[in-house]
């Protein structure tokens, strides 16, 4: 597990150990695992987690982002993981408070409307579902206070495309209206 070394401090060596023993990333699920501690920390920093926050992470995999979020101590922390291997991995871990609720589910089928109260959502989005998942989350989560998504370069180019360019489209207009 990526995140704790007994003092609940971030450990990149631990994620490398977990990945060495784990099955390879599944291309069919669009998996790509973060291995860089600085990148993981920067992504979590953008979420601006406070002790009163509720945080939901999509696709934690080995836990590069998960460990850092847990260290920040949100009031509530949930994981949605489609891959049963990684869902079981997180469910079996003993962690200090706050408790982490692990849902072995497909985020594309998740009832975003069911999230009560304010939520912050974060993900190193699976490549094959990044765009539709962003649409679902932003349009269906009733009280989304902040969302941070790491996406592949091509998706990022579409998100921030300028009018008249080949990448400009409905996703560009829609997302840019929120930022």
What are these regions (language model features)?
Residues 1-179:
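Catalytic cores of RNA-modifying enzymes
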